């Protein structure tokens, strides 16, 4: 008020609007707004631990508002069925359709495509994090309105949603997603802007030019669901449990791995704990060159510099990362055989190891070293196979030794595979009366 006087509210509101216009609502809510040397935080996310009482108090003061029949234009009297606001800032828009009136989610999609002008200030790209079309039976979503070209994706529990004895099939949207903590969690840890650069041919310049694009990423239901399930299972059971995530092509696996790595790296058993459950999260790809998509996703989700550490150099760099306790390390499985000795010295720490395409990664001598390096006492030494023909024997020896030794209490494995083999199921799967099964399944039909 000293700088703006009586016009403080108007000036600050204008500044916030300008920042959302240029940077998008996600960045503004995460980082706040700077004006004349001051930073204004517009939301307080749920604290990871309960050690900071002031943060706890501020978090409880967040205001959530659901507005029905939200008018959005100066040009007409059109209205959105529902808008969700955090501290006065719009974040989600919903069209709600009832089968009793002969409508379903497809009618809402048509409204978004043909009746909602994407040039309206409220509908500009990055102004909201998601646009939902909600029927009694299905939910669809989009993150960017662009007229008839608007792309909607399903936000359903499966191909069809299961019957809900307590209400509509889509009531999970309200019970699970549209809750205060869930919305805050989405904004803080999931939604993000993916920046892509591709080379395209420009006929005017007669050469290849770089074309930049942005995509607002909002998680699908199966992605939010598996992260939440794993989180709760770890809180219930602790470390030393293996998880097989059977998500097929088209499931957004790189995103799921990225979200999982960040969730695990900031997970506390109790709000009052000062130490995280996992000391280090290691993301392992089965490629000699780091998977650019997985690496890029994890880096783009990074909000604090230095949390994510891709191993780009020698094994010495990986050794240093592990010894210094880096939060998230990204490497290839080929790096593990040369550092078995180094990792064995860190046996009192707790590790979460996320492995991409485990059905192939766990075959061969690299698997032996990986298991050997992340155990308190090394697996018994044995002669390594020197060529492809020896791998089957090595596989059997690995499985025999792992099974005889049992689970390692300080290490949890999270294996992603679209087509797991029986050995993969036995090693990573969840025991059941019918044998081993994946902890979570997203099938080809669903994708």
Q: Where are these predicted regions, by residue range?
A:
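ATP-dependent helicase/translocase motor core
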Residues: 1-280, 289-305, 334, 343, ...
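Extracellular/periplasmic catalytic domains that process cell-envelope and extracellular macromolecules
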Residues: 86, 322-325, 406-409
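Structural recognition of the conserved hydrophobic beta-strand(s) that form the central parallel beta-sheet
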Residues: 132-133, 329-332, 411-417
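Conserved helicase motor
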Residues: 285-288, 309-317, 333-338
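Conserved motor-coupling elements within RecA-like helicase/translocase cores
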Residues: 314-329, 345
